[in-house]
């Protein structure tokens, strides 16, 4: 809680501004363990109490016994800042009332180790700040002195092992010099530290029990002073008889250091295994201060509270670890280096896990003790307090703070707010305590002088080893420090271009100008006050003061230190502005007379779990009743946290460390295969069963009567019969046999397989030891069988199918049957034949083809069989199920596939690949036929109507000079179109009457049987080589009758040299009789081209060219042949004429 009290007083020197900030640290001692509060472990909801294990080894060797003092130490640093303005009583040039300048916001600065914490990271977004801004409030309205304190209450954990107080007088506190004490038990101090082995040994020694002091409780109650004396003697004996880390010269509070020793005492032999994945976070929250505005007033001691609730999986074992992460912008303590985390304990004080803190990563690593091996279903809650890290966040800004438990994060947006300087006139100053070192017994204070960089005259700064009052005078009491020539005072000048961090804390002074030496002659000491004369200034300065303090006689802290700045205004009046910071500690005790608070008595509950064979709910009524071991029993605390144990071999359980007046719940887990017995079967509370859940309130005594009983749940059978239903009617007939080795699977109501079995030789099966409930039975179809019809008759005689549901209700169920019948097999095949007439039909005269390969594929395309046709062309595949298949015929070499699907299925050809479906019958109609390809040989000598267009280039040397008077009657009936290109140089005057009678009788008989389109091209290939050299000079008048019978198949080679003078009358009668018989039989769709028979009888079929480019050779040959024939005729005619003549 922050308390601030602003005061206003009028003095003869003027108004004095004074501000107070309090820094609070609360510490407790429990047993031998001391806990610096900052991190509060709460094993339970709403209980902000840090628990320390009793009889722990966290004190070093000189502090190994439990003391009875329940010291709750509050350490508070307070800054008293007041501003007072008065008329001076000294002579003044002129008496005036000056207007007061605005005063800085009045929130006090509280930086504390109020509570120990652990760290996590968050992002920082710093906004630029200018500390020179004068954010002040009118001091004339009110002047307040704010007393800020933070008090967090914690209770010690109970000490079960020793209810008697064992103490010894302590004399070392009296012998110790109070001005220079050093903490002998601080493992973190700067003195040489013992090796880890020594520390472990010391901690081990600290756990050894001591001889008890024979002092009764009654004597201690009646004589509190006796108790104090025992405590002192006990402490003194420890120091004189036990080995210690350092010389026992200090009475500084040990409780601030105990937390570190928790970490040191970790057993090194336990293997570490991170089990964050086995930690389930159920709730996380981040709260700033009172949680109303999410403003972190860092100088006012506003803490950041992180609450986390989580469960620990039962798989976690001793030595396993989990992590807690702070935000990177916070620290567990901003005044001390005490960052060691508190142990995780349950409400009874048992330690669940011990923690170590990594300052670099701001992460706590907790290592679990054997608590997790002893208990189950553990629920825990942890509350961690932290403060803004002024090094990470030097100026006001907005942050998103992120904390995490076991890697599961939660975030909160916060605004960081720092104090403004106290201002009056040109006086402006602010200060905070920045570091407490209990080992060296020093306190560090940082002071900002003139942070607003005003032009200040006659500036003096006082540093007092106590608080100052409203007049700037020393105020004795309420804490002090030692300010003398041994006090470290450093002065640094801030350059004009440098801005001071609003956090009021400097971590690196090297960036500022060290002007300490300039004050060697401007620094004076008097009555525990140091005065520094700055004179006239317009720059800001930083003063770092490290002063000594003296703990109280009982080792507590009572520290105060004040500072003030005074200047004169233009009228010569003084203006004061100041701060006072203080830390105080106090003991919280059980009573006002200083006596130790009596230890709280704790209680236990428990008893017995048994098997109630006769189910009457009363223990001992049946000789067969026996205790039940390993039954899980869960205790729920009032705050909702839980822990669980299991009954031992004798059926007993127990929970201890319970508080009087509180209500607890005990729950028993029903063991598998059992049911809870009757509740309250008798009025004897020691013999009855209290049921599965019991609520009990502690009424000043133990309660060991919380019992419960269970009895075994009855078991039942399920099953019956699997048979061969030969008549396929779905009814179990007397003559139908059972089927053995049928697999049967049993599933529970969730579908989980709980058993499998197979039928015996009689087809019977049975599942045993079943509870009431719904079950599913699945039958696997045996190989070679098909499920029969189901649900055709009464339940005990029908077939329930492949899957059925069975219900057990307080009786066996032996009616779940299933029937199958043998699955019939089928055949497939038929015939492959030689289709000689190529009609695709199986004729009686056509024979089968032997050794044709046939392949059978199933529906998946897998080959399931191959065979070859026999000598009759037959093939067959047997033992086939109904289904889809594919038959593939491999075409025999040299044969051609015949036409398909030309007639009925049993007589046609089905082709090379056939798809077939068998449905409860054989299929013998899958046939295929092949034939052998024929070659066509055609002799054709024909003179047919031909339309020939030929280009003939004939080079003929003909020198003819003829005078021919020819009268020729030419009657030519010719179907021949001949285009002859002849280059002849002839001088012929011929009048020719040619009577030519040409009969072309062509008889062509072509018998063609083909299933194809036939293109017939008349291609004449004629080789004619004619070289004619004719030199003719004739003058003839001839009348000749020429009867010429020529065959158009001629190959003539004519070499003629003639010199004639003729007059001829040529009568040519040409009969061409050609009889061509062509018989072509083709079995494929192949164009068959008629061939022209030539002299060489190549008889080659040649396709017509697509472009006509190949016509030249043929046409030329024809042309030349015709020319040679004509030439031959002329020669022949010439000879005849001569003969006639």
From Swiss-Prot:
User: What are its GO biological-process terms?
Assistant: cell adhesion
In chain numbering, motif YSIRK-G/S signaling motif lies across 23-34
Protein name from the UniProt record: Serine-aspartate repeat-containing protein E
NCBIfam families attached to this UniProt entry: LPXTG_anchor (TIGR01167), YSIRK_signal (TIGR01168)
| Family stated for the protein in its record | Belongs to the serine-aspartate repeat-containing protein (SDr) family.
Domain of life of the organism encoding this protein: Bacteria
Q: Where's the CNA-B domain?
A: 602-714, 715-824, 825-935
Q: Does the keyword Signal apply?
A: yes
| Motif LPXTG sorting signal, chain ranges | 1104-1108
Q: Does the keyword Secreted apply?
A: yes
Record organism? Staphylococcus aureus (strain Mu50 / ATCC 700699)
